[in-house]
Amino acid sequence: FLEKDKEELPILYNIESHFVYNSNPHTSTFNSSNEIFNNTHRLIVNAMKSNMHAVFTDCPHREKLGWLEQVHLNGPGLFYNFNLSTFAQKIMQDIRDSQLENGLVPDISPEYVIFDDGFRDSPEWGSASVIMPFMYYEFYGDSSLIVEYYDVMKKYVDYLSSTATNNIVSHGLGDWCDYRENEPYGVSHNTPVPLSASAHYYMVVD
C-alpha cells in the first residue's frame, strides 16, 4: 500500500451541497422580523424540496415510495410554496394507474411494491385520490382534475362505502406513528383506527 505523509494530505476547506428536486417552480416567499419564523419557514420549504422527485416521498433520507397521505397532509404547504400545475396532474395519473378494479387506491402510488393489510389499504392514504383534486380547485380555481379524475374519485368513495358497517370504516393504519413512550412505532396507539378512518371517509363523501 501507499502511505503518504500527513503534511501532503489535502485540506478540506469547505463543503457545499445542492438540493436535487423536481422542477416545480417556487412561487412564494416569506419574511418576518422574527428569525425563528424565517428559519422555520426555510427549513420547511427545504424539507418539501427534499421530498419532491418523481413522486412525493415522506422522508428524504430513506423512503423512496410515494406514500399518498403525504400528498394531502402537506398539500396546503406545497400549494402555497410551489406551482403544482404539472405535479398534481402527474400524481393523479399515478393514482389512476394504481387503482384496483374494485376501487381501492393503494397507500403508495405508483405501486412499485404490493404490501399487505393497512400498508396497502388505509383510508387516510387512499383518500388523497379525492382530496387532491378538490385542493387543486381550492387553490387554483381550476376544476380540471375533478373533471378528468371524477371516475377515480367516485370509484374510491364507492369502495370505502362498501367497507363501512353502519357508516363506520374500521380498517387501516389510523394515526400512524402517534406518540408512545418506550414502545416501537406502528399502527395508531392512542386514537382508535375507526375514528380516523371514518373521518377520512366522511371527508371524501362530503
Regions picked out by a protein language model, each given a short descriptive name:
Residues F1:
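Ligand-binding face of N-terminal immunoglobulin V-set domains in extracellular IgSF glycoproteins
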Residues K6-L43, K49, F56-I108, E138-A197:
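Active-site acid/base region of carbohydrate-active enzymes
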Residues V71, G126, P133, S198, ...:
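TPR repeat positional signature
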Residues P76-Y80, I131-E138, M203-D206:
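Short glycine/serine- and small hydrophobic-enriched flexible loop segments
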Residues E111-Y112:
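Mature catalytic domains of secreted/periplasmic carbohydrate-active enzymes
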Residues P123:
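N-terminal/domain-start segments enriched in small and hydrophobic, helix-friendly residues
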